[in-house]
């Protein structure tokens, strides 16, 4: 149990924090070095199944990486090609906020993983992600849905993998009456790298249990 808690802590720690490096070395956790938005980072390699391991990309706590990724994401699409930014909670929240700040956007939208008391008449769709067990739902308040109706929406995610979360966000935008103007991500993982309907900053492979790249 202690070992499990420590491993979760490693993922949350900033990649280059001295304590994070110490814990990864002490607990023999494999990492994958990457250049992301011009910054060098090491992603902890985490188990999904016995045959599938992924590199954990976490912006939480890494202000430098968040600012750099937001800057580069904004370069992927023309500013006049969309009206609003849209993402789902939770890992992409720092990114979308920083993108809005840098671009001067006054409003952006976040799909929530549960209905909130402040949401009037929320709409929802189902979502299944590689990093989340089971099927979950994404919710959007009717007030936000009304603002989205008829508008061009740029969907952003931190990592696109199986595409389940991305599809759920597309469905939620469509249910609100919005128009998907583009789909962008920091990283495209595994087979998602071959998609021609997304733009991303860097490819991310998937891994074997020994930390080697899965072919």
Which positions does each model-derived feature cover?
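Short, glycine/charge-rich flexible loops or terminal/linker lids adjacent to PRPP-binding catalytic cores
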Residues: 106-153
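Active-site-facing substrate-recognition patch
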Residues: 16-82
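PRPP-dependent phosphoribosyltransferase catalytic core
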Residues: 4-7, 12-28, 33, 167-215
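Conserved G/P- and acidic residue-centered "switch" motifs that form tight phosphate/ATP-binding loops
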Residues: 158, 163
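Short glycine-rich phosphate-binding loop at a beta-alpha junction
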Residues: 82-89
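Conserved acidic residues
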Residues: 83, 151, 181
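Short Gly/Thr/Asp-enriched flexible loops that form oxyanion-binding sites at enzyme active sites
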Residues: 95-103
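Gly/Ser/Thr-rich loops at beta-strand to alpha-helix junctions
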Residues: 89-95
